[in-house]
């Protein structure tokens, strides 16, 4: 089985991740079940169902790490953790990637770059640096390690 993840697959995954975050926000704006959409997003993009995941989201202060599916869901859609207002239900109008760097060696794949997030309600762009360590399960790419922080 070939577990190598190439740049094209990583770029496709990054686009899917960004589109997934935007889709959660769209569900929120349209009064649809955004929590269910967030759960589907997490199951598609994160490896929680395959073992341990290390997740340090961008906007956390009290509970820094979200290393289980429930607290990741809280981060994206609000809920379990009191500080969470829901990263994906801000909501964002656009998410653009730049400065993407790849590390692909044998069966190890990592990507880092910047995300430029524009909210619907104002023009202030949030710039976030991110690092994802990726792993392939069958034909699905999932995040094993996610670290992100805001650039001010």
Outline where the language-model segments fall.
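Short beta-strand edge/turn micro-motifs at domain boundaries
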Residues: 104-112, 121-152
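A solvent-exposed, acidic/Ser-Thr-rich amphipathic alpha-helical stretch
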Residues: 28-100
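Short, low-complexity N-terminal intrinsically disordered segments enriched in polar/charged residues
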Residues: 1-48
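Functional cores of ribonucleases/endoribonucleases
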Residues: 2, 84-122
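Short beta-strand segments enriched in hydrophobic/aromatic residues
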Residues: 21, 115-117, 147
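Aromatic-residue detector
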Residues: 14, 72-77, 119, 130
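A broad structural signal for short, well-ordered beta-strand segments within beta-sheet-rich domains
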Residues: 5, 9, 92-94, 142-144
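General N-terminal targeting signals
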Residues: 26-27, 34, 59, 119-121, ...
């Amino acid at each position: 089985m070939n577990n190598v993840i190439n740049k094209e697959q990583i770029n496709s995954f990054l686009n899917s991740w960004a589109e997934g975050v935007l889709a959660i926000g769209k569900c929120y704006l349209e009064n649809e079940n955004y929590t269910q959409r967030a759960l589907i997003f997490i199951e598609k993009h994160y490896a929680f169902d395959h073992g341990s995941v290390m997740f340090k989201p961008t906007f956390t202060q009290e509970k820094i790490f979200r290393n289980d599916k429930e607290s990741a869901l809280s981060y994206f859609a609000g809920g379990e953790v009191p500080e969470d207002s829901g990263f994906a239900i801000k909501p964002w109008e656009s998410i653009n990637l730049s400065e993407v760097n790849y590390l692909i060696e044998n069966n190890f794949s990592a990507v880092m770059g910047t995300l430029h997030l524009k909210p619907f309600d104002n023009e202030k762009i949030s710039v976030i640096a991110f690092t994802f360590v990726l792993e392939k399960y069958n034909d699905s790419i999932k995040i094993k390690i996610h670290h992100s922080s805001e650039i001010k």
